[in-house]
Structure formats: structure tokens, C-alpha cells
């Protein structure tokens, strides 16, 4: 078992130290608060990503509309036709 680069023996040591520091009554409360904070952070990151994708799609659609609305102008090079008769 390897979570965040921490193996099982390290996790046990961390839990024992946390149990000694906070006590058995506060440990579940702290775990619950930590879990809620992590879930809130994930939800915020997901919302940010969705908003970013939505704006990128909106910008792409705007660029497609503006490029399809204006047709490129045709340019004719007249100088090559007049230079062939100078020999």
C-alpha cells in the first residue's frame, strides 16, 4: 500500500503520533474535517476546470464564426505577366 509516496509502516507511525497528540476522542473529528476540506478542494478544482473548458470552447466557436464569415480575398500578381514581354 503506497499513498502519496507513504508506505504502510509510515502510515501506522503517523496514526500513532496523531492518536497521542489529539487523543482518541478528537481524532475522528479531525479526520472528518480533513476529508471535508479535501472534498471541497476537489470540487473547486473541478469547477475551475469546467469553467476553463467552457470558456475555451466559447472562444474557439467565436474564432470559427469570424473566420467563416469573411472570405479570403483573391490576389492576382500582375507583375509577372508584364515582365515576360521585356526580352
Swiss-Prot record:
Segments passing through the bilayer: 3-23
Which protein family is it in?
Belongs to the TatA/E family.
Q: What UniProt keywords are attached to this protein's entry? A: Cell inner membrane, Cell membrane, Membrane, Protein transport, Translocation, Transmembrane, Transmembrane helix, Transport
As for subcellular location, the record says:
Cell inner membrane
Residue ranges for the region (Disordered) are 61-87
Membrane topology recorded in Swiss-Prot or TrEMBL: Single-pass membrane protein
Organism of derivation: Trichodesmium erythraeum (strain IMS101)
General function of this protein: Part of the twin-arginine translocation (Tat) system that transports large folded proteins containing a characteristic twin-arginine motif in their signal peptide across membranes. TatA could form the protein-conducting channel of the Tat system.
Assembly notes: Forms a complex with TatC.
Identify the InterPro entries for this entry: TatA/B/E, TatA/E
Q: Where does this protein chiefly localize? A: membrane
Extract one GO BP annotation from the record: protein transport by the Tat complex
Give a Pfam family name.
Answer: TatA_B_E
Looking up NCBIfam families in the UniProt record yields: PRK14857.1, PRK14861.1, tatAE
GO cellular component: a single term = TAT protein transport complex
Q: Which GO terms describe its molecular function?
A: protein transmembrane transporter activity
This protein is called what? Sec-independent protein translocase protein TatA
Amino acid at each position: 500500500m503506497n499513498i502519496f509516496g507513504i508506505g504502510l509502516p509510515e502510515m501506522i507511525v503517523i496514526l500513532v503520533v496523531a492518536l497521542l497528540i489529539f487523543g482518541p476522542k478528537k481524532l475522528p473529528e479531525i479526520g472528518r474535517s480533513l476529508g471535508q476540506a479535501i472534498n471541497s478542494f476537489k470540487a473547486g478544482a473541478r469547477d475551475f476546470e469546467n469553467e476553463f473548458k467552457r470558456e475555451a470552447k466559447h472562444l474557439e466557436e467565436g474564432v470559427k464564426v469570424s473566420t467563416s464569415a469573411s472570405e479570403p480575398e483573391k490576389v492576382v500578381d500582375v507583375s509577372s505577366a508584364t515582365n515576360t514581354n521585356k526580352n
